[in-house]
Each structure stands twice: as C-alpha cells, then as structure tokens.
A protein has these predicted regions:
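A short helix->loop->beta-strand "cap" motif at the edges of active sites that frequently abuts
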Residues: 115-125
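A short, histidine- and acid-enriched strand-loop-helix "catalytic/donor-clamping" loop
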Residues: 102-103, 123, 129-139, 168-171
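Short aromatic-enriched loop/helix-cap "lid" or pocket-rim segments at secondary-structure transitions
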Residues: 17-18, 45-50, 108-109, 136-142, ...
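Short N-terminal targeting/anchoring amphipathic segment
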Residues: 84-104, 123-128
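Membrane-proximal helix-turn-helix segments that form the acceptor-binding/catalytic region
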Residues: 114, 133, 142, 148-194
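N-terminal strand-loop element at the rim of the active site
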Residues: 7-13, 20, 24-77, 81-90
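Extreme N-terminal starter segment of soluble prokaryotic enzymes
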Residues: 1-3
Length: 197
C-alpha cells in the first residue's frame, strides 16, 4: 500500500510529529511505501520522492506575514498545487492527514478529491485528530483563563470571538471563528473517510 502522511511540520516539533514519524516507521516495517508532505524546514527529517513541500510559514514574525495571515489561513494555493504533484507521483492509496490548519489549510483536501475525480483513482483520507480543531477554533476547548469551555460545540463557533479564545485577541478569535464557519459551510471536514481520535 502507498501512504502519504501529511502534517504541517516535518521536523521534530511536538507530539503530532513524534506520532507521524513513528506511524510512518511502523508502516514501512510492514512493507508499505510511505512518503510525507508538509512545509519545508531546515530541520525536516522525512521526505517525499520529489522533495516537494510548501514554504515555511511562521505567523509570529514579520509585518507582511501578519497582513496576509487572514487570507493564507483559509486556502493555500501553494499547498494545493504542491500536494497535487506529490499525488501524481506517488499515486497513494491512503492520505493520512494530521495537523494541517493555518499553514496547509483544507485546500489539500479539495486537491485530493479533485485528484480522485481527474484520475479515477480512489484515495482514502484518514485524519488523526491531535486536538479539538474540528469543533473548536482555538483547538483547545479552553478560554485564555484556562477555564474549560464547550460553547463552540453544536456549530456555535462565534463564541470563540465572544470570549477572545485565540491568544486573548478579538481579531485572531474572529479569524478563527470565520475560518471554522467557512469550513463548516463548505463541508471541508466531511471529506475525511475516517477520523482517529
């Protein structure tokens, strides 16, 4: 089986990266072909045959980045184009999606489904939920005070803005709420065939 593992970071950065490296290693031990797609980074430790990755995006630096932030978190044309190249080359049976929001965006999901339609191939999209992104714009189900919160459940993502849940910022929380509503409206997360929690 051919598996493409997608994660925004392809270098040691946290728990999801430890997870994808181990899953990939175990799949390879079982004889599966595994490649990776995400952002380029000088510390990248996994790859795909084409060495095709998106540019490294860090929203915490640079004034230009901050101006482009609202647009780049919603849809990445770069990610859509580059994952398509990797899909055409690898022709995966499964795409295992992990952390992708903000940098890679659901544009990759649309690109995978478009690839299926154009090639006639069936690709299963498996998503591992490393956080609460699908139901909570700030990923944590927690207010800035640390108080646990479930107010966004039931498609009520505007509560994120009301409580300034993302970095205690009304603007960032509004962007998170808008992002969640757009993906809800476009059924982006319904493109997953399987969700692992």
């Amino acid at each position: 089986m051919k598996v493409l593992i997608v994660n925004k970071f392809l270098h040691p950065n946290g728990g999801s990266e430890t997870y994808i490296f181990e899953v990939g290693k175990q799949l390879q031990k079982m004889g599966h072909q595994v490649e990776y797609f995400g952002m380029e980074h000088e510390g990248r430790v996994v790859s795909n045959r084409l060495d095709c990755y998106t540019g490294n995006m860090d929203f915490h630096t640079g004034k230009l980045q901050k101006l482009l932030y609202p647009f780049r978190i919603l849809y990445s044309t770069e990610a859509a184009k580059k994952i398509r190249k990797v899909l055409d080359d690898l022709q995966p049976d499964v795409v295992h999606v992990n952390n992708f929001n903000f940098q890679l965006t659901p544009s990759i999901l649309y690109a995978i489904r478009k690839y299926e339609k154009q090639t006639g191939r069936t690709v299963r999209i498996v998503y591992t939920a490393h956080d609460s992104q699908l139901v909570c714009p700030n990923h944590l189900m927690q207010r800035p005070s640390g108080e646990l919160c479930q107010e966004c459940l039931g498609q009520k993502q505007w509560n994120c803005t009301k409580h300034k849940c993302i970095h205690n910022s009304r603007v960032k929380s509004l962007l998170g709420s808008v992002e969640a509503k757009i993906y809800q409206h476009n059924h982006a997360y319904r493109m997953f065939d399987t969700v692992i929690c």
